[in-house]
Curated annotation (Swiss-Prot):
Residues where N6-acetyllysine is found: 359
Name recorded for this polypeptide: Protein disulfide-isomerase A4
GO MF terms held by the record: integrin binding; protein disulfide isomerase activity
InterPro entries documented for this protein: PDI_thioredoxin-like_dom, PDIA4_PDI_b, Prot_disulphide_isomerase, Protein_diS-isomerase_A4, Thioredoxin-like_sf, Thioredoxin_CS, Thioredoxin_domain
Disulphide bridges: 84-87, 199-202, 548-551
Pfam name, any one: Thioredoxin
Broad class of the protein's primary localization: endoplasmic reticulum
Gene Ontology biological process: blood coagulation, fibrin clot formation; chaperone-mediated protein folding; platelet aggregation
Enzyme Commission number(s): 5.3.4.1
Subcellular location: Endoplasmic reticulum lumen; Melanosome
C-alpha cells in the first residue's frame, strides 16, 4: 500500500514538471512571436525611412523626405500617381533628367513621390494634379510650369541651383488703402483678389493666381492681377462687401464687377482675356438686324445711342458687362436701324427671332435709356424679357435660360428646319394658348431625343404618345402628365392641377433597403426627404457614382466615419448613388463625384458643401464637428 502511494507521488511530480516545461515553451514561443512582430514593424518603419533609388531617381515618402532634403541645396521633385497616364509617359524622360543632373557639378538630386500614398507631402506642396514638378531650393518650393522636356527642365533646375539665384518678384500687385484707388481707377481692366492669410482656399489659389498674373502680364496691353489682404485692409473689404475668402472682383476704370470664372491658371487667363474685350458689338448695317431676326436662335438685344460718348451708352456698357456671360449684347448709332425698329435713339430694344414670336406677346420690348438710368435697371429689364412666351429648351441653353422654376416642358420632335417647321409650330401654338394664362410659370418645348434620359426618368419614354409634358418645380421634384392625346385643354388641366397641389411627383429611385442599420445609411430617391431632409437631425450625405474611382477610394474612409459617429442619435452619416436616384431638392447640386453636403437640422434648405481639404477621416470629422448643431461625444471621446 505504501509502495503504491509512493509511485503515485512520483507520477504527480513528473506530470507537474512536464506541464511547467510546456508552459515555459509556450511562453517562449509567445515571446518569440511578439519579438518577431516587433521586428516586422521595425522593418516596415525602416523601409519607410530608407531612401531607395530606381533608375537614378530617389524614391521619397512622408517618412524619409525631411532627412533626405535637409542637407541639399537643390532637389528636383516629381509628384505622381501610379495610375496616371501622363506620369507613365513622362517616366523615361524623368530618368534621363536624373542621369544628366547626377553628372552636374555639383550633382543635383532628382526624386519622385507617390502623392497618392504620401498624403502629408501632397498636402504640404498643394499637389492637385499629376505629374506636378517642383524644385526645392534651400527647403523652399519653386513651382515649375514649363514644358515636360529634358532640355527645359534641366535648364531651369541649373538656373535655380546657382548660388546667387533668388526667386523673381511677384507679378501680382499688392494693394492697400494708400494705392488701391490710383491703381484700380487707372486700369481699363484689373482682377483683384481679397484674401486672408490663414484661408486654405486662398493658399490653394495663390500659386495659380501668380501663374495667371505672369501669363497675362505678357499680353499687349497687359491685364494686371492684384491682391488685397482683407484682414489688414478692413476698410477696403467693407467697401466692396467682402464676406468670404477669397473674393475676386473685376474692376473697369474703378467700377467693380463680380468675377465668375475658374480658379486655376488657364481658366483665369482665358476668362480675363474674354472679359477684356468689349461687352457689346456694334451693328453697322440693317442687314445684320434682319439676319438676327430671321436666322437667330436667342433673344436679340440692341441698344440705340447718339454715339460712343453718350452717357446712356456708358450705362448700357456697364449693364452688358454684368451680363456678358449670359447674353450677347449689340449696339448701334444708326438712325436707319432705329427707324426699322420703330424707335428713336436712346432706347434699348429686346426682340426674339421670328420663329419665337406670337400674337400673345409684343414684338418688341422697348426701354428708355438715359445717362441717369441705373445699369442695374437695364440688367433687370433684359433678364425679365429675355425669354419668349414659349421658347426652345436645349442642352446648350438649359443652364442659362431655363433654370427658373416652375418650368413646364412639352417634349416632341422639335425641328425648326424648313421641312419640319410647320409641324413644330403646330404643337408650339397649342402650348402658347396655355402659357398666356400662366405668366408665373416658364414654358418651353424640348426635343424628345435631346432629353431622352429626362423623358425616361419621367416614365414617359414608353407612353406611346407623340407629345408628352412635365413640370419641374422649385424643390427639384418632377411631375409627369398622364399619357393621352395632347391638346391645349389637356395641358391646361395638367398645369391647373399642379397649381392646386393635386399632382404626385415622379421620383427615380432604387428599391428602399430592407436593412438599413449599418454605420452609413443608404439613401434612395424615395427616402431622400425622410432621411436627408429630416428637420430634427444633422445629416452628412455623400453623393457618389458606382464607377467613380475617387468614390471607391473614399468608401472605407466614409465607413470608418460612420462607425465613429454611430452612437450619435442626432447625426446621420449617409450616402446616395446619384446616378440611380433623384435628388428631390435642388439645393443639393451635384456637378462631380463624390460630392458631400452637411444638412444641418432646422436649416435643410441651406446645406454646407464640403470643399477643400483632404477627404480623409480627420478632415471629414473636423467638418462635421464644425457644423454640428447638436454635439455629443463620439466613441473615441468616451
Amino acid at each position: 500500500m505504501k509502495l503504491r502511494k509512493a509511485w503515485l507521488l512520483v507520477l504527480l511530480l513528473a506530470l507537474t514538471q512536464l506541464l511547467a516545461a510546456a508552459s515555459a515553451g509556450d511562453a517562449h514561443e509567445d515571446t518569440s512571436d511578439t519579438e518577431n512582430a516587433t521586428e516586422e514593424e521595425e522593418e516596415e518603419d525602416d523601409d519607410d525611412l530608407e531612401v531607395k533609388e530606381e533608375n537614378g531617381v530617389w524614391v521619397l515618402n512622408d517618412g524619409n523626405f525631411d532627412n533626405f532634403v535637409a542637407d541639399k541645396d537643390t532637389v528636383l521633385l516629381e509628384f505622381y500617381a501610379p495610375w496616371c497616364g501622363h506620369c507613365k509617359q513622362f517616366a523615361p524622360e524623368y530618368e534621363k533628367i536624373a542621369s544628366t543632373l547626377k553628372d552636374n557639378d555639383p550633382p543635383i538630386a532628382v526624386a519622385k513621390i507617390d502623392a497618392t500614398s504620401a498624403s502629408m507631402l501632397a498636402s504640404k506642396f498643394d499637389v492637385s494634379g499629376y505629374p506636378t514638378i517642383k524644385i526645392l531650393k534651400k527647403g523652399q518650393a519653386v513651382d515649375y510650369d514649363g514644358s515636360r522636356t529634358q532640355e527645359e527642365i534641366v535648364a531651369k533646375v541649373r538656373e535655380v541651383s546657382q548660388p546667387d539665384w533668388t526667386p523673381p518678384p511677384e507679378v501680382t500687385l499688392s494693394l492697400t488703402k494708400d494705392n488701391f484707388d490710383d491703381v484700380v481707377n487707372n486700369a481699363d481692366i484689373i482682377l483683384v483678389e481679397f484674401y486672408a492669410p490663414w484661408c486654405g482656399h486662398c493658399k490653394k489659389l495663390a500659386p495659380e493666381y501668380e501663374k495667371a498674373a505672369k501669363e497675362l502680364s505678357k499680353r499687349s496691353p497687359p491685364i494686371p492681377l492684384a491682391k488685397v489682404d482683407a484682414t489688414e485692409q478692413t476698410d477696403l473689404a467693407k467697401r466692396f462687401d467682402v464676406s468670404g475668402y477669397p473674393t475676386l472682383k473685376i474692376f473697369r476704370k474703378g467700377r467693380p464687377f463680380d468675377y465668375n470664372g475658374p480658379r486655376e491658371k488657364y481658366g483665369i487667363v482665358d476668362y480675363m482675356i474674354e472679359q477684356s474685350g468689349p461687352p457689346s458689338k456694334e451693328i453697322l448695317t440693317l442687314k445684320q438686324v434682319q439676319e438676327f431676326l430671321k436666322d437667330g436662335d436667342d433673344v436679340v438685344i440692341i441698344g440705340l445711342f447718339q454715339g460712343d460718348g453718350d452717357p446712356a451708352y456708358l450705362q448700357y456698357q456697364d449693364a452688358a458687362n454684368n451680363l456678358r456671360e449670359d447674353y450677347k449684347f449689340h449696339h448701334t448709332f444708326s438712325p436707319e436701324i432705329a427707324k426699322f425698329l420703330k424707335v428713336s435713339l436712346g432706347k434699348l430694344v429686346l426682340t426674339h427671332p421670328e420663329k419665337f414670336q406670337s400674337k400673345y406677346e409684343p414684338r418688341f420690348h422697348v426701354m428708355d435709356v438715359q445717362g441717369s438710368t441705373e445699369a442695374s435697371a437695364i440688367k433687370d429689364y433684359v433678364v425679365k424679357h429675355a425669354l419668349p412666351l414659349v421658347g426652345h429648351r436645349k442642352t446648350s441653353n438649359d443652364a442659362k435660360r431655363y433654370s427658373k422654376r416652375p418650368l413646364v416642358v412639352v417634349y416632341y420632335s422639335v425641328d425648326f428646319s424648313f421641312d419640319y417647321r410647320a409641324a413644330t409650330q403646330f404643337w408650339r401654338n397649342k402650348v402658347l394658348e396655355v402659357a398666356k394664362d400662366f405668366p408665373e410659370y416658364t414654358f418651353a418645348i424640348a426635343d424628345e431625343e435631346d432629353y431622352a434620359t429626362e423623358v425616361k426618368d419621367l416614365g414617359l419614354s414608353e407612353s406611346g404618345e407623340d407629345v408628352n409634358a412635365a413640370i419641374l418645380d422649385e424643390s427639384g421634384k418632377k411631375f409627369a402628365m398622364e399619357p393621352e392625346e395632347f391638346d391645349s385643354d389637356t395641358l391646361r388641366e395638367f398645369v391647373t392641377a399642379f397649381k392646386k397641389g393635386k399632382l404626385k411627383p415622379v421620383i427615380k429611385s432604387q428599391p428602399v433597403p430592407k436593412n438599413n442599420k449599418g454605420p452609413v445609411k443608404v439613401v434612395v430617391g424615395k427616402t431622400f426627404d425622410a432621411i436627408v431632409m429630416d428637420p430634427k437631425k444633422d445629416v452628412l450625405i455623400e453623393f457618389y457614382a458606382p464607377w467613380c474611382g475617387h468614390c471607391k477610394q473614399l468608401e472605407p474612409i466614409y465607413t470608418s466615419l460612420g462607425k465613429k459617429y454611430k452612437g450619435q442619435k442626432d447625426l446621420v452619416i449617409a450616402k446616395m448613388d446619384a446616378t440611380a436616384n433623384d435628388i428631390t431638392n435642388d439645393q443639393y447640386k451635384v456637378e462631380g463625384f463624390p460630392t458631400i453636403y452637411f444638412a444641418p437640422s432646422g436649416d435643410k434648405k441651406n446645406p454646407i458643401k464640403f470643399e477643400g481639404g483632404n477627404r480623409d477621416l480627420e478632415h471629414l470629422s473636423k467638418f462635421i464637428d464644425e457644423h454640428a448643431t447638436k454635439r455629443s461625444r463620439t466613441k473615441e471621446e468616451l
